[in-house]
Structures are given as structure tokens and as C-alpha cells.
Regions:
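Bacterial N-terminal signal peptides that target proteins for export
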Residues: 2-12
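Sec/Tat signal peptide C-region and signal peptidase I cleavage site
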Residues: 21-27
Length: 426
């Protein structure tokens, strides 16, 4: 990704200002312009996420109407395409409470998939932390939640979101969103750190030649989850529209808006992506710790997270229809204040993107992400570690940018995997 280096003349005066809090009116306007464009890009990204989710929903309709290998593959392909713009929105999660409070409905993971459907015996039959570990709501029209019988005869969107999602207060009870749909399309990946993704047969939805029973309820669940994904993304698209709640919140105070941008960049880079999504799985050599674990699409999701982080700095975004958005950006703001710091930030973002692209290329041509993190895979481990190192290194420069813009103390997300690795094994 090439970061735009064209400086706007109005930003030149920033170099002489001592602190953002004391900027003259015209420079404050420039900070406001950066935040405004940040919100505009958010709206475009969520709108693209909505568009691709609608395409996924249509593909699911076509699959359920005529179950077969081709229609199932088309639904899987639509799911993978839908992940691209959504993962590029994740940089908006941290620093924007409206997004953080909402995102668990669409991208929560990992999930205890036995809540939803049948599982292999290797999954186990119980969990000390989750009484619904093998509830299999598709097979059971009544389930117990907090010791009480709950009617599960209708697997409606309202039931999934209002009753089943995080049932019993357990975060692993993920009933909605991309990963619930992923499980219903692919099934469990039973290959460990060996090759291969989930292999759910299309006949799991074939009412005339049903496998694993309850094909009608499985279809009902899949359609309800897809319907919810569309409606949830519509909500966030509206929140980032001009005058939407998220837009109003971030634009109300330009300085706080800049802090939100950098909080997103730093927290996603360090604690969430480098730590929880990558280093943890690498330390444990555990395929269950990969983000898109049923589909083996994890390397693409991580790459698009990194693209989103870089875009939050550059202000650039290429929409799913090919339209390119550019505008006032942190890159411009930092370059006008400290050219060397901007060059450092740009170089580190690009180095991380190079490492992520190398990981994605390996995922496409040699081995999938769950194989890369396998124990004893020195070369694969090193490819993943290089991407982690890039994320950690760019976070250090994000912290320098925060200081240069005089944004005060910003607490970025951490991770035991990075900060206290011994705790991971306790």
C-alpha cells in the first residue's frame, strides 16, 4: 500500500505549533478535517461490509433453495469476500465506544461451536466454564440456560441475538456473526495443524437427503444468522453516516478524535492482533487460536486488519467497487509537524504490510495459517513472528505520534502473550 504524501498547504503552519491543544484556529480546523475524513472512510467501509454481507445473504438463500456442492461453495466464496472490508473496519473498534459495544454481535470469537450444532467426539462433552458447551440448539428444541428450561423451537434472529448470544454470561457462547455463519458453512476443522479446512457436506442442509439430522433447523439457524449480520451492519453503517451517532461522537472534539484514531491503530496492532490473535496461538501452537478457524481464512483476515491500520494513518481506502477514497489524514498532520516521524511511521506500516503479504502468499501457495503456527514448523513460525514483530514495532511509533501531537496519555490494549508470556501457560 502506497501512502499518500501530498501535503496540503493549510497544514504547513502545524510545524510551528507547540501542541495540539494550543493550535491556532486554522490548524484546529485541519485536525477537524482529518477526523471528518476518518468518519467518511468508516462509513464507506461499513457500507462495503453491508454490501458484501447482503451478497452473502443472497448466496445463502440460493444454497438453501438448492443445496449442492456448487451452491455451498458459492456461499463460502461470498463469506470470504465479505471478510475483506469488514476486517479493514476493525481499527475503528478501539477508541470508539459505539463500535466496541457493538462488534461482539458480528465478530466475536473464539466460539464453543457445540452450542450451535453437532460436533466431533474430539471436541469433548463438557466444560467447567460453559454449561452450554454441547447444547446443540439445532438438535434440541428446549435447552437449559442458568438452570431454566428455555424454548428453542424457533431459531429466529430475535432468539439468536436476544437469548442465545452469550447465554449464561459466557462469552464463548457466540451465536451470531461471521464466525457462527462460518461454522455453519464449513463445519469443524478437524485437521489440527495439518492441511485442510472444515468439510461440512451440503447434505447437512438437504431436506430430501439429510445428513446429521435437523436439516430444516440448521437451515433456519443459518438464515437467521445471515439476516442478523445484515441488520447489524446496517446499524453501524447508519451510525457512521453524516449525522450518525458514531460520527457525531468522534467529530465533537477534534483532539479526542485524533486520539480515537491512534487508539485504534495502537490497540489493534499490539494487544489484539499481535497479541491475542497471533502470538497466543504461536506460543501454544494451537490451531483453535486462529481467527477464521473453520475456513482457514485467517491469514487474509490478519492482512486486512493490517491494511485497515495503515489506512487509518494514510486516509486512503479502495472500496469494493474499485473507487479510491483519499483525504486529510494523520499522515498529513504528522508530516507537517515532524517529517522524519511521518517517514518512520509510514515505513513501519509498510514493513508490516510486507510481512503480512508474505504470510498471506504462504497461506495461498504453501500452507494455511494453522499449519504455520504448528509446533516444529520453524519456517512457518518465523513468517508469523515477522508479522508480529512488525505490528509491535509500528506500535512503538504510534506511541511517538501520540506524544508528538500532544494527545496526553493513551492506554493501548495489552496482551499477556506479549507482556507476560508465562501467564499463558499457567
Amino acid at each position: 500500500m502506497k501512502l499518500n504524501r501530498n501535503l496540503r498547504a493549510a497544514l504547513a503552519l502545524l510545524a510551528a505549533s507547540a501542541a495540539l491543544s494550543a493550535l491556532p484556529a486554522h490548524a484546529e480546523t485541519d485536525a477537524a478535517a482529518v477526523v471528518k475524513h476518518y468518519a467518511e472512510v468508516a462509513h464507506a467501509k461499513y457500507e462495503d461490509s453491508l454490501t458484501t454481507a447482503k451478497a452473502l445473504d443472497a448466496a445463502i438463500d440460493a444454497f438453501l433453495a438448492a443445496p449442492g456442492d456448487a451452491t455451498l461453495q458459492a456461499a463460502k466464496d461470498a463469506w470470504i469476500k465479505a471478510r475483506v472490508p469488514y476486517q479493514q473496519t476493525e481499527v475503528y473498534r478501539f477508541g470508539n465506544p459505539i463500535v466496541d459495544d457493538w462488534e461482539g454481535k458480528v465478530n466475536a470469537w473464539p466460539l464453543d461451536e457445540g452450542l450451535i450444532d453437532y460436533v466431533d467426539t474430539s471436541y469433548g462433552t463438557e466444560s467447567d466454564e460453559n454449561s452450554l458447551y454441547v447444547a446443540n440448539v439445532i438438535a434440541n428444541k428446549t435447552i437449559k440456560i442458568d438452570g431454566k428450561d428455555v424454548d428453542a423451537s424457533k431459531l429466529t434472529p430475535e432468539f439468536l441475538s436476544g437469548t442465545l448470544q452469550e447465554a449464561g454470561g459466557v462469552e464463548a457462547n457466540v451465536a451470531t456473526g461471521y464466525h457462527a455463519i462460518e461454522f455453519l458453512l464449513w463445519g469443524q476443522d478437524l485437521n489440527g495443524t495439518g492441511p485442510g479446512a472444515g468439510k461440512r457436506p451440503y447434505t447437512d442442509y438437504d431436506l430430501k437427503n439429510c445428513t446429521h439430522d435437523n436439516c430444516d433447523r440448521r437451515a433456519e439457524y443459518l438464515k437467521s444468522a445471515s439476516t442478523l449480520l445484515v441488520s447489524d451492519l446496517q446499524e453501524m453503517t447508519d451510525d457512521w453516516a453524516p449525522g450518525g451517532e458514531a460520527t457525531k461522537h468522534v467529530e465533537a472534539d477534534p483532539k479526542a478524535g485524533l486520539a480515537a484514531i491512534l487508539t485504534g491503530m495502537g490497540s489493534l496492532s499490539y494487544g489484539e492482533l499481535a497479541g491475542e490473535r497471533m502470538k497466543l496461538g504461536l506460543l501454544l501452537h494451537d490451531p483453535e487460536e486462529e481467527h477464521d478457524c473453520f475456513s482457514d481464512n485467517t491469514y487474509n483476515s490478519h492482512l486486512n486488519d493490517a491494511i485497515g491500520i495503515a489506512a487509518a494513518y494514510s486516509g486512503e481506502y479502495t472500496r469494493v467497487d474499485g473507487t479510491k477514497l483519499t483525504g486529510p489524514s494523520l499522515h498529513d498532520l504528522v508530516a507537517a509537524k515532524d517529517k522524519a516521524l511521518d517517514e518512520e511511521m509510514t515505513a513501519k506500516l509498510n514493513k508490516t504490510l510486507d510481512a503480512m503479504n508474505a504470510m498471506a502468499k504462504r497461506g495461498e501457495t504453501i500452507e494455511k495459517y494453522d499449519q504455520m503456527i504448528g509446533e516444529g514448523n520453524t519456517e512457518g513460525n518465523a513468517v508469523v513472528q515477522a508479522a508480529i514483530d512488525g505490528l509491535i514495532d509500528q506500535t512503538k511509533t504510534v506511541e511517538r505520534v501520540i506524544s508528538a501531537l500532544d494527545l496526553g496519555k493513551i492506554q493501548l490494549e495489552g496482551s499477556d502473550s506479549l507482556d507476560n508470556p508465562n501467564a499463558v501457560f499457567q
